[in-house]
């Protein structure tokens, strides 16, 4: 199965490693390019070191990115801890679908710091 990963931070890294160790093909990784303060272990850097095609995460906001997914015959798009709103055409482009992996109970704990808010309201 061909997978495209859109992600950030440790959640994105965990999914990157899980897909890399699976029988599935990682067709591309979309993440935020490292800045001057990056520690060198962000998703972009790790994916590049592992040899994966790396693209700016903001591409998912553009309808035309759906054409790239279809051209690659992508089966699944995984969106993990990304701050970008994925364009509807991009969501619908993968053959089997797109999946948003979110650590909070949606819609109540949408956004940032979901775990902290869940504990606060417990």
Predicted regions: what they are:
Residues 1-122:
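One-carbon transfer enzymes
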